[in-house]
A protein has these predicted regions:
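Preference for extracellular/luminal or secreted protein segments
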Residues: 1-183
């Protein structure tokens, strides 16, 4: 618990989304990004835990994959009426034989990608890999958690809700030396 609390790092906070409150952003869309083998439900247990904990805080949380997204029959304005905040939960683990991991969006048109960051507040939580900002430089609020387990998810929620301050100091350059990741 102590390690999780002291390691989670607020890398980028350009939107001042934090702390989260159900009054400010009651309806959350949760997007899972992972290279892990999925259980039958299709959702990692840590993602399910995050959803459950946020719901206990008073948020209405739904999975992006279960809903509609902007297209010909469902406008961006309609999407914004049912979504106040998008949370990306990334758990892309590297291995000894695969040291470079890049995000590949699940759907053909990249609907789950952060292409609506100028229209909707978006929060990117990176578990297990501190370099995802390279793939999502447009995201304005980005947090590194370094490992994916229940203890870290609990600690993350405490920080998101403002009950625990971010104490982590990145052991690497999460901006990867790129200018656009800092925007």
């Amino acid at each position: 618990e102590r390690i999780a609390d002291q390691s989670i790092t607020l890398v980028k906070n350009k939107e001042n989304l934090l702390p989260l409150t159900p009054r400010k952003t009651p309806k959350i869309k949760l997007i899972q990004i992972t290279n892990e083998r999925l259980p039958e439900s299709g959702i990692l247990k840590e993602v399910e835990l995050l959803k459950e904990l946020l719901e206990k805080e008073g948020f209405e949380v739904s999975y992006f994959k279960d809903g509609k997204y902007p297209d010909v029959d469902f406008s961006l304005e309609d999407y914004k009426k049912e979504t106040d905040l998008v949370i990306y939960f990334a758990n892309m683990k590297v291995g000894s034989n695969q040291t470079t991991i890049r995000i590949t969006w699940d759907d053909f048109l990249g609907e789950s990608s952060p292409k609506y960051v100028c229209d909707l507040p978006s929060l990117f939580l990176s578990f297990s890999n501190p370099y995802h900002l390279v793939d999502v430089p447009m995201v304005r609020t980005y947090i590194n958690a370094y490992t994916c387990n229940a203890t870290t998810v609990y600690a993350m929620v405490e920080k998101l809700m403002g009950r625990s301050e971010f104490k982590g100091i990145s052991p690497v350059d999460p901006f990867a030396g790129l200018w656009d990741t800092k925007l």
